[in-house]
Amino acid sequence: SQGFSTPTVAETLTPEGQINTDLKPETGTNFELGFKGNWLRNRLYTELSLYSIQIDNLLVAQRISEDQYVGINAGKTNHNGIEFLINYNFAFAKKILVKPYLNAALNFFEFDEFINNDQDFTGNKLPGVPKYTMNFGLDFKTESGFELFTNYRIVGELPLNDANSEYNDSYNLLNLKASYSFKIYPGLQLNLYAGVNNALDVHYASSILTNAVGFGNQAPRYYYPGNPRNYYGGIQMSYCF
C-alpha cells in the first residue's frame, strides 16, 4: 500500500513565522505479511507480522529554542519490523483458568538518506524507537471470582538523537493486579481490585524528547522520569437488568 502525510500548519512555519515552501509532504510504501492461527483445540493462539515501510521526506520536528520547533524533511527512512503474539489457555484443577502470554516487537528503523546542516546521518537508527519491546506474564482466573494479572515489560535501549551519540538504557517493569468479584444481590455484582505498578521500583524514563537541545548552559533534557512504585485500588459495582 502507499500513502502520504502533509505537514501541519505549525510544521510549515519558519522561525520567523513565514511559510516554509521547501517543506514537502512525506510519502511511504508499506509491505506487510501476517499470519494468525489457533492450535491445540483453540487453546493456543498465535500471530506473526512482518512489515517493511519505506518513507521519503519523513517529517520530523527540530527544536530551535526552549519552546519552539520547526518541521524539516529527513530524506529517506526504512522502517522494518517483526511482531508476534502467543497466548495459551488451560484449566488447572478444573476450577482455575491459567493464561500465559507473550508478545514482542523487533524494530529495525534507520535513516536511508538524511543530511541536515552538513551532518550526514545516513545509516543511523531513528531516534525514539527501542530495539525491541516485550510483554509476558500469567493471568489466573478462578470459578470463585478471584483473578490475578501479572505483566513483565521489557523495553530495549533507544537512541535519543539523530547522531545516535546518546542512548536511553533498556529497562524492565513488573505490574501486578488482583481482583475479586461476587454477587451481593440478584443481578448486582461487586468487584474489588488492587494492584501495584513498577513493583520493583525501577528508575526509568516514561517518555523521551528526541533531539533535545540545552538552553541557558543547561544539559539537554531528553528524559521525563516514570513513576516509582505505586499502588492503587478500587471498587466497581454493576447491575444487569
What does each of the following model-derived ranges do?
Residues 2, 25, 37-39, 76, ...:
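Residue-level signature of outer-membrane beta-barrel architecture
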Residues 19-25, 36, 70-74, 90, ...:
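Outer-membrane beta-barrel proteins
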